[in-house]
């Protein structure tokens, strides 16, 4: 989903009662695309590559010579790693800052334990990492060129200035057309004004 100047959506169950795992990532859009109309795309067949004991699904961006068809407005990547027990060397781009989130199982990165559900920040300048697991593990590798524009976020609003967030909140509260309309049995979420401190 690409928010552009604003988007609404509903997250509703399907009746499935098994266990689900999900990760929601927000990527700030660059100034030249953040005022465009919102968009949505569904990609059922994402490319994969095998590395040592890992199967890597390229959700977005490029990884190990494989390119996802998903839209991206900045130079970044998101890779779903399905790790079998053992050691896997994962290539990285040195100009990216990276992070790894362990979703299920457990692993170490270059010998350091990673707490499941937390982001292990790897910074810029690495060309590879070694992931070691004693059990089947699922992890998400994210990375990208450091963003060189200021970004503010409050609730679901992502902007560059307080004024933009205040305007977005007013438009949401007044149900302005910029956010669109969602036909859903769920109630529309209401939120109070931003708690700005005086400047």
Locate each region found by the language model.
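Jelly-roll (double-stranded beta-helix
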Residues: 1-199
């Amino acid at each position: 989903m690409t928010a552009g100047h604003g988007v609404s959506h509903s997250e509703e169950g399907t009746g499935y009662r098994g266990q689900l795992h999900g990760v929601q990532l927000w990527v700030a859009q660059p100034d030249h695309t953040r005022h465009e109309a919102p968009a949505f795309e569904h990609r059922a067949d994402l490319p994969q590559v095998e590395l040592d004991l890992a199967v890597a699904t390229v959700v977005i961006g490029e990884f190990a010579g494989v390119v996802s068809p998903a839209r991206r407005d900045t130079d970044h990547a998101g890779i779903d790693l399905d790790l079998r027990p053992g050691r896997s060397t994962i290539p990285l781009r040195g100009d990216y800052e990276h992070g790894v989130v362990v979703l299920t199982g457990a692993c170490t990165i270059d010998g350091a334990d990673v707490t499941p559900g937390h982001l292990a920040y790897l910074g810029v300048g690495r060309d590879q990492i070694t992931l070691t697991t004693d059990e089947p593990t699922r992890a998400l590798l994210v990375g990208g060129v450091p963003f060189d524009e200021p970004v503010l976020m409050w609730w679901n609003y992502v902007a560059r200035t307080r004024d933009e967030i205040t305007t977005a909140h007013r438009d949401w509260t007044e149900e302005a057309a910029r956010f669109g309309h969602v036909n859903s049995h769920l109630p529309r979420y209401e939120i109070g004004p931003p708690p700005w401190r005086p400047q």
